[in-house]
């Protein structure tokens, strides 16, 4: 399935929507489907693994069967995490922590992966690996929801982009080619009156 991307300026509600889908906050209206609530895993800057834990301990906690599932289905992610197994979470870079979280979600057979600006504070190498990882898992059987305001990574992910337009209190599905159109940027940034 294509990656679902929520795009917009800071404070427009992208993260709030993601937290609602994750069950962290209650919806203002309606109901989040129970399958989504029960089968999601959120990767973000405000949820963390205890720093003193070793990656090997995380793998042991997940169990051999679950780790082997990741190894067989997502070999590149397994190999990446396996190389880190002797390190404590404290010694991992931000990007490595996020990949360990994604590994955990895959080992737990979660169907929905929710990421809130997960590439923030990542160097170019880790950002590239993270984006490639998301593309890889989305091409299998994982549904990825991704919050960002970075146009370059949105274009790289090549998913379904839903843009939050605060002036009109609306969310609009857009095409990747619209992301580089200055009129569209003006609508998002300055609240232009229209975009045709």
PLM segments and residue spans:
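Helix-to-loop junction immediately C-terminal to a conserved catalytic motif
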Residues: 22
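Q-loop/switch helix immediately C-terminal to the Walker
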Residues: 51-67
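Conserved ABC ATPase signature
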Residues: 88-92
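ABC ATPase nucleotide-binding domain "signature" region
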Residues: 100-105
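A short, proline-enriched helix->beta-strand linker immediately N-terminal to the Walker B motif
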Residues: 107-111
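Walker B catalytic motif
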Residues: 117-118
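ABC-family nucleotide-binding domains
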Residues: 123
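H-loop/switch region of ABC-family ATPase nucleotide-binding domains
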Residues: 147-149
């Amino acid at each position: 399935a294509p990656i679902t991307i929520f795009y917009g300026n800071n404070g427009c509600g992208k993260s709030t929507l993601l937290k609602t889908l994750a069950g962290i906050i209650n919806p203002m209206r309606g109901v989040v489907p129970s399958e989504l609530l029960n089968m999601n895993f959120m990767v973000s800057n405000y949820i963390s693994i205890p720093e003193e834990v070793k990656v090997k301990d995380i793998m042991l906690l997940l169990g051999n069967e679950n780790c082997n599932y990741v190894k067989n289905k997502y070999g590149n992610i397994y190999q990446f995490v396996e190389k880190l197994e002797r390190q404590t979470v404290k010694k991992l870079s931000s990007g490595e922590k996020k990949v360990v979280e994604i590994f955990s979600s895959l080992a737990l057979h979660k169907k929905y992966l929710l990421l809130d600006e997960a590439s923030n504070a990542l160097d170019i190498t880790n950002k590239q690996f993270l984006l490639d990882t998301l593309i890889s898992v989305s091409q299998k059987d994982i549904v990825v929801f991704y919050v960002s305001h970075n146009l370059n990574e949105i274009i790289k992910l090549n998913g379904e982009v839903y843009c939050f337009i605060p002036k009109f209190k609306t969310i609009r599905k857009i095409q990747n080619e619209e992301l580089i159109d200055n009129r569209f940027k003006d609508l998002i940034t300055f609240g232009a009156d229209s975009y045709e």
